[in-house]
Amino acid sequence: MKFTFVTLFQNIVEGYFNDSILKRAIQKEILEVEYLNPRDFSDSRHNKVDDSAVGGGAGMVMNPQPLFDALDELKRVDSEVHILFLTPVAKSFKQNDAKRLSKKPHIAFVSGRYEGIDERVIEKYADEVFSIGDYILTGGELPSLVICDAISRNVDGVLGNSDSLSVESFETELLEAPSFSKPEIYKNISVPSEYLKGNHSKIRSLKLALSTCKTKFFRPEQLLKHKTQLH
């Protein structure tokens, strides 16, 4: 699977792929990552990529020309590339989106800066637009990485143990049950005794109960979705 990051700040993004699971996936050629800088496509004398907002307003807006040319080149090389834009005004990215998008062969993330991207770019090139939450960041690179990570771990071969995907939060609308490590007792705090007895049927039942309690406490709306799903 190939990811293209359309960004003014490649250094912010590429460091994320220098360690751990995604680095290994790149080394195994399961994932491929490339970068496209809109500044390289600017036709202004000083490679300018932003301008003041038409109609007034604070701050600068990424102007259309560099992004139009960059994305035209991207689509010229691969007409099937799936282009994502990240903005807090869009729908929230969900686990089901990560699973669905993991089947795409090539995804591009367009990262905004300043006060955002000229809307004409989004209207022309966006296949999908997502938000990662109701808050504002200084740029789109971090949201792009969040979504890229969520997608990547659903790509076959990226995780060492693919079974771990099936028990994670949101796979059944319930949050994942609590996890514990060794030692079994630490500072007088013990792992639930049922975990230690080796009865896998009872362990599964306990995990389901703990998962349900956790969901009810932290995300009650997810519990309602789970009950609806059962019916």
Curated annotation (Swiss-Prot):
Cite the HAMAP family for this sequence. Answer: TrmD
Task: From the Swiss-Prot or TrEMBL record, give the protein name.
Answer: tRNA (guanine-N(1)-)-methyltransferase
Binding-site positions, S-adenosyl-L-methionine: G112, I132, G133, D134, Y135, I136, L137
Coiled coil segments of this chain? none
Broad EC category: transferase
Main function: Specifically methylates guanosine-37 in various tRNAs.
Q: Which reaction does it catalyse?
A: guanosine(37) in tRNA + S-adenosyl-L-methionine = N(1)-methylguanosine(37) in tRNA + S-adenosyl-L-homocysteine + H(+)
In short, the EC number is 2.1.1.228
Principal localisation = cytoplasm
Give the location in the cell.
Answer: Cytoplasm
The subunit structure is: Homodimer.
Q: Which family does it belong to?
A: Belongs to the RNA methyltransferase TrmD family.
Task: Identify the domain of life.
Answer: Bacteria
Sorted alphabetically, the Gene Ontology BP terms of this entry are: tRNA N1-guanine methylation
Taxonomic classification = Bacteria, Pseudomonadati, Campylobacterota, Epsilonproteobacteria, Campylobacterales
The organism is Sulfurimonas denitrificans (strain ATCC 33889 / DSM 1251) (Thiomicrospira denitrificans (strain ATCC 33889 / DSM 1251))
Supply one GO molecular-function term: tRNA (guanine(37)-N1)-methyltransferase activity
| Keywords of the record | Cytoplasm, Methyltransferase, S-adenosyl-L-methionine, Transferase, tRNA processing
What GO cellular component is one of the record's annotations?
Answer: cytosol
